[in-house]
Swiss-Prot record:
Role this protein plays: Immunity protein that plays a role in preventing early activation of toxin Tse3. Occupies Tse3 substrate binding site and prevents the substrate from entering.
Signal peptide (UniProt feature, chain positions): 1-15
NCBIfam families: Tsi3_fam
Keywords, sorted A to Z: Calcium, Lipoprotein, Metal-binding, Palmitate, Signal
GO molecular function terms noted in the UniProt entry: metal ion binding
Region described as Disordered: 53-85
Complexes and interactors: Forms a heterotetramer with Tse3 consisting of two Tse3 dimers and two Tsi3 dimers. Formation of the complex inactivates Tse3 enzymatic activity.
InterPro entries, A to Z: Toxin-Sub_Inhibitor_sf, Tsi3
Residue numbers with lipid attached (N-palmitoyl cysteine): 16
Protein residues bound to Ca(2+): 126
Protein's recorded name: Immune protein Tsi3
Keyword check for Lipoprotein: yes
Amino acid sequence: MKTVALILASLALLACTAESGVDFDKTLTHPNGLVVERPVGFDARRSAEGFRFDEGGKLRNPRQLEVQRQDAPPPPDLASRRLGDGEARYKVEEDDGGSAGSEYRLWAAKPAGARWIVVSASEQSEDGEPTFALAWALLERARLQ
């Protein structure tokens, strides 16, 4: 009976991972203490406050994300969303796009002690607001050491 339960739990975990489609391949540590994981298929560059990720390959609409450490809290009027064991504040803005649809920009922050970890991402979509699954997964995994 324990074996069956273990197998079912393993299958459920695999289904969750496959459904999200978010995989990471390398842990990156910034001199400011920010620790993030690089998404598979993305190039990473260190910036003054964090990291920038650019989707590689010959894509029509490559995604771009930035993760940074921020000292100032986000504005209080942002929407909130559950993120892991905590909560994140966020906003999504839409601009008219080109042939690939509207451009959407996510800005989201989660508390990390007295500081904040901030993710910003942009995606183009012809089908309405994207889920930003990668950006949310990146923010959830990011931490300060």
